[in-house]
C-alpha cells in the first residue's frame, strides 16, 4: 500500500522536478508544489493532480504555508545564472527552508546538490550549492543529500545547448571550461 503522506516539491518546473512529480504521483503520493508563478505548472500534464501553492521561497510565509501538513520536502531550488547575487539568494532560501521545515516538523528534506570537492577553488554557484547542503544538513530536520555532477537528458539545459550547437555548427572552437572533468548523469 502506497504511503499517502503529503510531499512538497520545490523546483517542480525544472528538469528534475518536472520528472520527479509524475513518479511520486504514480507511486500513490499526494504532491504539493511551491511555485513563484503557478501558471508555469499548467504546461505539465500532471498539473491538475497536484496541489499548487503560489509563493517565493525567499518569503518565510510562503514556505510556512507550503510546508503545512507535509512529511517530506524536496529542495530542488537553485540560482540559474550562478553569479554572486544568486549564491547569496540560494543561501538565504536555504536558511528560510530549513527554519520553515523545523517549524512544520517535516520528517525529511531531500536535497539535490552538486558533486564537488569543497577544498578546490569553486565558482560562486558551486560554492553556494555546497553551502546550501551544509545549511540544510545542520538544521534539526534529517536531510538526504543527493550529489550529482551534470544531469544530461532530453530537455535539460545542457542537453539542449549541446544539441543546438551541434545542429548549427559543423566545427566548434571549445572554450577552456569544455576541458573540465565532469561526471554527467544521464
Language-model region placement:
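A conserved pocket-lining segment of Rossmann-fold NAD(P)-dependent short-chain dehydrogenase/reductase
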Residues: 164-185
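N-terminal Rossmann NAD(P)H-binding glycine-rich loop of SDR-like oxidoreductase domains
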Residues: 2-29
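A short helix->loop->beta-strand "cap" motif at the edges of active sites that frequently abuts
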Residues: 103-108, 140-141
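NAD(P)H-binding glycine-rich loop region in Rossmannoid oxidoreductase-like domains
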Residues: 39-104, 114-119
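SDR active-site strand-loop-helix element
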Residues: 10, 34, 76, 109-115, ...
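Conserved glycine-rich Rossmann-like NAD(P)H-binding loop of the short-chain dehydrogenase/reductase
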Residues: 29-36
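Active-site Tyr-X1-5-Lys
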Residues: 121-149, 154-164
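Rossmann-fold NAD(P)-dependent oxidoreductase module
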Residues: 19-23, 100, 135
Amino acid at each position: 500500500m502506497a504511503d499517502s503522506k503529503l510531499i512538497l516539491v520545490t523546483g517542480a518546473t525544472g528538469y528534475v522536478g518536472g520528472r520527479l512529480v509524475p513518479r511520486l504521483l504514480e507511486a500513490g503520493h499526494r504532491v504539493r508544489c511551491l511555485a513563484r508563478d503557478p501558471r508555469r505548472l499548467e504546461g505539465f500534464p500532471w498539473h491538475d493532480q497536484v496541489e499548487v501553492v503560489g509563493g517565493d521561497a525567499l518569503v518565510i510565509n510562503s514556505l510556512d504555508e507550503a510546508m503545512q501538513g507535509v512529511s517530506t520536502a524536496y529542495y530542488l531550488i537553485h540560482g540559474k545564472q550562478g553569479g554572486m547575487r544568486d549564491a547569496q539568494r540560494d543561501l538565504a532560501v536555504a536558511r528560510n527552508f530549513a527554519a520553515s521545515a523545523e517549524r512544520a516538523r517535516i520528517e525529511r528534506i531531500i536535497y539535490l546538490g552538486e558533486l564537488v570537492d569543497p577544498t578546490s577553488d569553486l565558482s560562486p554557484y558551486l560554492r553556494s550549492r555546497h553551502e546550501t547542503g551544509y545549511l540544510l544538513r545542520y538544521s534539526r530536520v534529517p536531510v538526504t543529500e543527493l550529489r550529482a555532477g551534470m544531469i544530461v537528458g532530453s530537455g535539460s539545459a545542457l542537453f539542449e545547448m549541446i544539441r543546438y550547437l551541434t545542429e548549427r555548427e559543423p566545427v566548434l572552437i571549445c572554450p577552456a571550461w569544455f576541458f573540465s572533468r565532469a561526471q554527467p548523469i544521464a
